[in-house]
Curated annotation (Swiss-Prot):
Keywords: Amino-acid biosynthesis, Aminotransferase, Histidine biosynthesis, Pyridoxal phosphate, Transferase. InterPro entries: Aminotransferase_I/II_large (IPR004839), HisP_aminotrans (IPR005861), HistidinolP_aminotransfase (IPR050106), NHTrfase_class1_PyrdxlP-BS (IPR004838), PyrdxlP-dep_Trfase (IPR015424), PyrdxlP-dep_Trfase_major (IPR015421), PyrdxlP-dep_Trfase_small (IPR015422). This is Histidinol-phosphate aminotransferase 2. The keyword Lipoprotein does not apply.
Length: 366
């Protein structure tokens, strides 16, 4: 029996998501130690002590189900951003939410729109529900918003826009986003995926929550895996108008956020100083990457995230493999249609030093 023959038609066209190679896997494969992983845009600075304390206090309660509605976390988010708890949907990471949006608002025959070189989860969820992929060609590695507007049709139900974008790091300004929203029909849902927004400077950051008051078709999606350092716990949240949130929570699986994640999320979201320190350290180390690339005449895409994408002007797979042998894991992105590029997460200073040394050896820089 070939079970693919009875699978959902959309599933047949999918390939499994390829995450960044784990350190333990490389240790097994090559028998090397002191490996540096700069592949998954994780927070190298960890998470604050307040979150660790909150997790330990929760351990004795793990025989009980978590709060299915995430009351305390919703209250924390609402207070922090000036929204109402009934506007919030919680997810098992923002990936969970990105899939939830598609299941709630699109079905077979509907169009879901996103940019070329956008987060690979967008096409995955689109194909999984048999919706129509509407990939808009990129403009300077980023979103061509006019291209989105031109491509709109009566079948368009959902638009995903990551800002900053992953894996390219491009960034749209508040004005660009508002001008775009003003042209999108009210019956088309726009998802603003802000997983990396905390790495932008406060003065340039999009005030997306204020846009909710004007555009009822907007959903803001955020993650606590990046700047907040909770990637292993899987927790994210979406903010929208209450009617949309109600629909999302009808589809959302019960108990989709575990007790430890909910508890740690409350702690980290109350620790602004920690996140500010993480963002500032990221900017310092990002400048080192930019200086390294400029010194060695490597083209890169300017990034507002916690990663940088380098164009090697040749197939990057051999460079990736050579870096693995040097004990450095980065991210090949041929699956994004960028076979000449590698994406490198910004790490601790000593981790970045190891990358600079390894790449210099691989490319034989003087």
């Amino acid at each position: 029996m070939q079970y693919i023959n009875i699978a959902n038609r959309g599933v047949k066209s999918l390939s499994p998501y390829q995450a960044g190679k784990p350190i333990e896997e490389l240790e097994r494969e090559l028998g090397i130690s002191n490996i540096v992983k700069l592949a998954s845009n994780e927070n190298p600075f960890g998470f604050p002590e307040s979150a660790k304390k909150a997790i330990f206090e929760q351990l004795d309660k793990l025989t009980r189900y978590p709060d299915a509605n995430g009351f305390e976390l919703k209250q924390t988010i609402a207070k922090k951003f000036g929204v109402q708890p009934n506007q919030i949907t919680l997810g098992n990471g923002s990936n969970d939410l990105l899939e939830l949006f598609a299941h709630t608002f699109a079905t077979e025959g509907d169009e879901i729109m996103y940019s070329q070189y956008a987060f690979i989860v967008y096409p995955l969820v689109t194909k999984a529900i048999n919706a129509i992929v509407k990939e808009i060609p990129a403009k300077n590695w980023g979103h061509d918003l006019q291209g989105f507007l031109t491509a709109l049709s009566d079948k368009t139900k959902l638009i995903y826009i990551a800002n900053p974008n992953n894996p390219t790091g491009n960034f749209l300004t508040s004005q660009e986003i508002e001008d775009f929203l003003a042209e999108v029909p009210e019956n088309v849902i726009v998802v603003l995926d802000e997983a990396y927004t905390e790495f932008t400077r406060s003065e340039e950051r999009v005030d997306s929550f204020s846009l909710l008051k004007k555009y009822s078709n907007l959903i803001i999606s955020r993650s606590l895996s990046k700047a907040y350092g909770l990637a292993g716990l899987r927790i994210g949240y979406a903010v929208s108008n209450p009617e949309i949130a109600d629909l999302l929570n009808r589809v959302r699986q019960p108990f989709n956020c575990n007790s430890l994640a909910l508890t740690a999320a409350v702690a980290v979201m109350n620790d602004d100083k920690f996140v500010e320190k993480v963002a500032e350290n990221n900017r310092i180390e990002m400048r080192r990457y930019e200086d390294f690339c400029q010194k060695n005449q490597l083209d890169y895409i300017p990034s507002k995230g916690n990663f940088i994408t380098i164009d090697f002007k040749q197939p990057a797979a051999p460079i990736y493999d050579a870096l693995l042998r040097e004990g450095v894991i980065v991210r090949p992105i041929a699956g994004y249609g960028m076979p000449n590029h590698l994406r490198i997460s910004i790490g601790l200073p000593e981790e970045n030093d190891k990358f600079f040394t390894a790449l210099s050896k691989v490319l034989k820089f003087a």
